[in-house]
Amino acid sequence: MQGEDPVSEIGDIFQLIIMEMLRKICKQDPSQKPRLMNAIFMMSESKSPSVLFECANTITQLTTAPSAIKVAIQSYLNLLQENNDNNVKVIVLDKILQLRKNYFKVLEDYINDILAIIKDDTIVSLEINQKVLDLITYLVSQRNIKEVVQFLEREILKATKMDEHGAQGTVTNEYRYLLIKSIN
């Protein structure tokens, strides 16, 4: 993997095979892990969503180092921002939610990126919004409470305006309920 060619020029399937091989080697021979983690980090720069997802999963399986977990979280967040498929977003959010207990401090640094997941003027998916709200309410701290409260207030106003314009009636009411529940 050394040389001038960027990771993105290697096909997705080949990248996934390499990722699986690296994961297996690291699990079978942990002494190889420090050397092979660099290759995994290089692959986290892939443009392929499936490779990015597998890379993040591999990192979280092989290490607990905060710097490595940051790479995994950033990969997950990139997937959330670049992907329009709600099913993919739900799966990725579930992965991030699994990290929240062990990596609270690391995730806390990404609160703005997490807030940005809910950015549309429409409610695309209540399930996605609920998972994001669950995550941000878990990550609220003295350091970020002001940002989170301002975000929740903006979202309540947005839902109220949508309701006044007759957009997405029941969904808007459910979303507003989730927001109010998050504040409490």
Which residues does each predicted region cover?
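Extended alpha-solenoid helical-repeat scaffolds
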Residues: M1-N184
